[in-house]
Amino acid sequence: MIIDGKALASDIEAEVRERVERLGFNPGLATILVGENPASQMYIRIKHAACERVGIRSENIVLPGDTDESTLIKTIQGLNKRGDVHAILLQLPLPGHLDPRKAMMAISPEKDADGFHPENMGALLLGAERLVPCTPRGIVYALEHLGVDIEGSEAVIVGHSNVVGKPLAAMLLNRNATVQVCHVYTRNLKEHTKDAEILVVAAGVPRLIKADMVRDGAYVFDVGINKVDGKTVGDVDFDAVKEKAAGITPVPGGVGPLTVAMLLSQTVTAAEMSLERQRS
């Protein structure tokens, strides 16, 4: 089975529209783009188009590529103070002279659309999932939507980034999966992946995972986006692995749409949290 990320994202967007209607106002998302990275510009356009579809008011703040740290932090602090901005997203990567960790820590935890703030990451590790990284949240949503029994399952994640691998491991542990986290430095990677019932690959290595590394009937989520001979491919040898997997996400059209849809959901969550604070 091909796991259609676009179809799942459409379901999420329908849920988000209903939540926006119940709120009675349009939540606000502010994105910050530093520089003119073409890929980042494309991702920003995709996110703002998605906001428009579900009734989220969005604005994009573009800063020059030579923006200094002080200016970026002040821009974020200004958005923190605005009542009409419920969620803030800092588009990564930043230019090399800027420290993404300092910038992320400047975002108010209550407005942290990406779930990268240490306070939100800490809550996740303690089992309190408030605002969490969007890609892991999308993967967990897909597993639950497909009726996969996460509890007790053998889950292997290839990739230990702060964006995908680490937070996804915490989310799966919170649901009582048995989790292994591997990476490109793992010795004998096949020995780990071949028994996985849930396999998530986010290593940034084109077609790293071959068919003989995958268990029959596994659910495989390919987070990789790589360019090979002008084509976009993932970290999984899709054509070979799809014959063995119970479900597999394509690249493109798999995890990417889920990530964007979860950004919308988290923006509404941030607005709902803001409303609760006002009422209490």
From Swiss-Prot:
The protein's name: Bifunctional protein FolD
Subunit structure: Homodimer.
Similarity section: Belongs to the tetrahydrofolate dehydrogenase/cyclohydrolase family.
One GO cellular component term: cytosol
GO terms of biological process kind: L-histidine biosynthetic process; methionine biosynthetic process; purine nucleotide biosynthetic process; tetrahydrofolate interconversion
Lineage per the UniProt record: Archaea, Methanobacteriati, Methanobacteriota, Stenosarchaea group, Methanomicrobia
Pathway terms, separated by semicolons: One-carbon metabolism; tetrahydrofolate interconversion
Molecular functions (GO terms): methenyltetrahydrofolate cyclohydrolase activity; methylenetetrahydrofolate dehydrogenase (NADP+) activity
Residues that coordinate or bind NADP(+): 159-161, 225
SUPFAM superfamilies documented for this protein: Aminoacid dehydrogenase-like, N-terminal domain, NAD(P)-binding Rossmann-fold domains
Function: Catalyzes the oxidation of 5,10-methylenetetrahydrofolate to 5,10-methenyltetrahydrofolate and then the hydrolysis of 5,10-methenyltetrahydrofolate to 10-formyltetrahydrofolate.
EC number: 1.5.1.5, 3.5.4.9
Name of the gene: folD
Reaction catalysed by this enzyme: (6R)-5,10-methylene-5,6,7,8-tetrahydrofolate + NADP(+) = (6R)-5,10-methenyltetrahydrofolate + NADPH; (6R)-5,10-methenyltetrahydrofolate + H2O = (6R)-10-formyltetrahydrofolate + H(+)
Keywords (A to Z) from UniProt: Amino-acid biosynthesis, Histidine biosynthesis, Hydrolase, Methionine biosynthesis, Multifunctional enzyme, NADP, One-carbon metabolism, Oxidoreductase, Purine biosynthesis
CDD domains (alphabetical): NAD_bind_m-THF_DH_Cyclohyd
